[in-house]
Each structure stands twice: as C-alpha cells, then as structure tokens.
Amino acid sequence: MPLLDSFTVDHTRMSAPAVRVAKTMKTPSGDTITVFDLRFTVPNKKAMPEKGIHTLEHLFAGFMRNHLNGEGVEIIDISPMGCRTGFYMSLIGQPDEQRVANAWKAAMEDVLKVKDQNHIPELNVYQCGTYEMHSLAEAQDIARDILSHTIGINHNDELALPEDKLKELQI
C-alpha cells in the first residue's frame, strides 16, 4: 500500500495548536489545491471528545468559509481527522499559514458565540449521520482551549521522518 503524505511526518514532534501545509497540487486546468493540517491537540497526548469534534465539524466549516474565502481562496472541504487531534482543510488557492491561523482564531471566537444546540447547522436526522452525537459545550471548550494559545506553524521540513525510520516502520 502506498505511504500517504500525512504519515511521512513525525507526529511526536508536532506542536498544537498549529497550521501545516500538508500538500499542494495542481489541477489539470492549473488551479492550486492546498491541503492544510489544522492540528488542535498534540498527537498521542490528547484527543478531542467525539461529541465536541462532531459539533465543531458542523460549525467550523461555515465559520472558516466566512473568514477565509475570497482573495483567491475557496474552501472545498473541512473534515475531522480520525485520530481526533485536528482537521484537514482542502481549498483552492495558496493562502499563507498566518492567514489560515487568523481565520481559525476568528472561527473559534464565532463558536463561542453560538447560544445553544438549536443554532448548530444541519443538526437533524435528515442532514447528519449521527445527529444525536453532539455537544455544544464540548465544542466551545475546544474553542476556548485554542483561543488560550497562540496558533503556531508546523513545517514539513522540521517534521520529516528520515528515510531509514520510514523503512523501519513499514509493514
């Protein structure tokens, strides 16, 4: 099985909260697609609670679009990582990491302004696969935690696993 890009970086050296350009690629028509790793918690130290990350998924996607779309950027998708330590954000364009960090911070401030669960988008049996698995309180705790820190930048060259380590780890 091919080694995915996300597994070529050393998760033991990642900081959080932090933005990382996980991948860039060109479409056949010449557009740039950038995938960002938005790392909320330090891997293998703390995972976001499942109800909180699910609620955050519903809120974060819209709030990030409000703060980041425009000036050559259009978000395609924001999805939680299976490890529950962050989100992947795919977009058209190449905003710098600080612009993404600023939008992320503004989105977390928006999460704190949500008054109750009735204001969570698509929170119903028709639009959500596990609509009863939500917690606004947990999502707001996650947002408060992010806002209590400076959002840093993780650099691939500083996190790259050496070739010998990759060979050692291959199954």
Curated annotation (Swiss-Prot):
What cofactor requirement does the entry state?
Fe cation
What SUPFAM superfamilies is this protein classified in? LuxS/MPP-like metallohydrolase
Q: Which reaction does it catalyse?
A: S-(5-deoxy-D-ribos-5-yl)-L-homocysteine = (S)-4,5-dihydroxypentane-2,3-dione + L-homocysteine
Which InterPro entries does UniProt cross-reference here?
A: LuxS_sf, Metalloenz_LuxS/M16, S-ribosylhomocysteinase
A Gene Ontology annotation in the biological process aspect, one of them, is:
quorum sensing
Looking at its record, which EC class is this enzyme? lyase
Domain of life, per UniProt, equals Bacteria
State its Enzyme Commission number(s). Answer: 4.4.1.21
Q: How is the cofactor bound?
A: Binds 1 Fe cation per subunit.
Q: Name one GO molecular function term.
A: iron ion binding
- Alphabetic keyword roster: Autoinducer synthesis, Iron, Lyase, Metal-binding, Quorum sensing
Show the Pfam families listed in the entry: LuxS
Membrane-spanning parts: none
Family to which the UniProt record says this protein belongs: Belongs to the LuxS family.
Complex and partners: Homodimer.
What the protein does comes down to: Involved in the synthesis of autoinducer 2 (AI-2) which is secreted by bacteria and is used to communicate both the cell density and the metabolic potential of the environment. The regulation of gene expression in response to changes in cell density is called quorum sensing. Catalyzes the transformation of S-ribosylhomocysteine (RHC) to homocysteine (HC) and 4,5-dihydroxy-2,3-pentadione (DPD).
Name of the protein described by the UniProt record: S-ribosylhomocysteine lyase
Which gene underlies this protein?
A: luxS
